[in-house]
Each structure stands twice: as structure tokens, then as C-alpha cells.
């Protein structure tokens, strides 16, 4: 890794859940992406070689170690890296893995949370270097049934009407239960994955696929703008990357009504 071109480690659990808008922002900062596709058996590298770690979502549970033995190694990497101060950005499963790695319980909740739904920031978010940019209420894509208990030392940053835990920070590590990064082209890809399509139709009804895609289409500009603004704040203030020459400051997102 060179000072001119910092590298971030991306832990990806399935091909159809890439960093999307987060990766767009990474590339805009001139960073290199080292992607590991864990579900394809790719080995974990030495985390010390990277300026930060981004862990994405997936259909598995953070507790599925017996079915997916590589999860234990991934959680150990996360625990070691985060305890050493390496910046971390976890999304959906990535947030649950962060909680589990640091001693929080991950478990199946009372009901699934699916669709474009309101998220509310906590009072603590106002003093956070990343979440201070978030409006008090914003819409985000939800698709999960598992949730987590905060690990020791964590600060809660967001909640929703369905689940108390939606975002948290532990030092330089952030976990976001929701998806802000998904553009409509990626939602359309999810609809082409049979297991994802079946899950949506089960949870949202026969027209679930169409409704989800249209929700993402309607809110894409707001959600991806917020994704990139929060991620840029993390890159600058937590990872410590230098803002690229000529890059405009992130636009402060406005509050939007829930879907």
C-alpha cells in the first residue's frame, strides 16, 4: 500500500451485494479496493496491510459458523483489526458481524424488516464525526430478520420503529443495519436471484419485487447521496484519507419522509 494510493479491504459475502455507492465514493477518493469474495472460498489477507475494512451484507447469519466455517475466521479478523484501531464500515450482515466480533449477541428478531422505511438518528449521532451529517429522519432500504445487542463500549447512532438497533459505532468501527448504497440497477439484480426473489414475494406479496424496485427507484437519489456523504466523512475523519484536490464538500442531506 502506498501513501498515494491507499487500499481498503472489502469483505463481500455474495456477488450481488457489492459496496455499490460506497465503492463509487472510494474510487472518487483515489483509493484502491482489495475485494475478497468469502462465499467463493477466497482467503482472508493480512488486515494490517489496509487503511480500513468495508464488510457488506449477505443472506447468511453472523452465527452460521457450522454451516460456513469461514465466518469464524472473518469474525476473528474483524475483532483483531477493530481492537487494534483499524477503521471499519459494516453494512447489514457486516454490522451484525461487527457486533458479534466484539461480544454483542446476534439473533433472529420478532419480525422481518423489509422495504424503504424511516430511520431515526439518536441524540448521540449529533456529536459523531460521521453521523452528524445525517438528518434526524431519513429513508433507507431494509432487508433483514436478524438483529443484534450492542457490544460493550458501543454508541447507538440510529433506530427504527421495528428495531431499536440500526447503527452504532465503537471507536473507528461503524455498523449500519440498513442499506443506503443500493441503486436501482442493483435492486433489479437482486430480483434476478431466485432465492432473493422468493424471499421478497414471501415477505411482501406477489408484487413484492416490483414494489421494492419502485421504492428504490423513487428514493435512489436521496439514499445514495446520503450513503456517499456519510462514507466520505468516514474516509476523511476516521480513516484519515486526504480529500482529493477539487472534490466538492459533501452536500448535507435533508430529512425526507419515510416510504
Residue ranges and their predicted role:
Residues 1-84, 201-259:
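N-terminal beta1-alpha1 cap of cysteine-dependent amidohydrolase-like domains
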Residues 7, 85-87, 155, 172:
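Short active-site oxyanion
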Residues 19-21, 45, 64-66, 98-101, ...:
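Short glycine-/acidic-enriched loop or helix-start segments at secondary-structure transitions
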Residues 25-28, 69-73, 106-107, 158-159, ...:
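Glycine-rich, phosphate-binding/catalytic loops in enzymes
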Residues 55-125:
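Cysteine-nucleophile active-site neighborhood
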Residues 102-186:
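Pocket-forming structural segment of enzyme catalytic cores
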Residues 180-216:
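C-terminal helical/coil "lid" or tail adjacent to the Rossmann-like core of SAM-dependent
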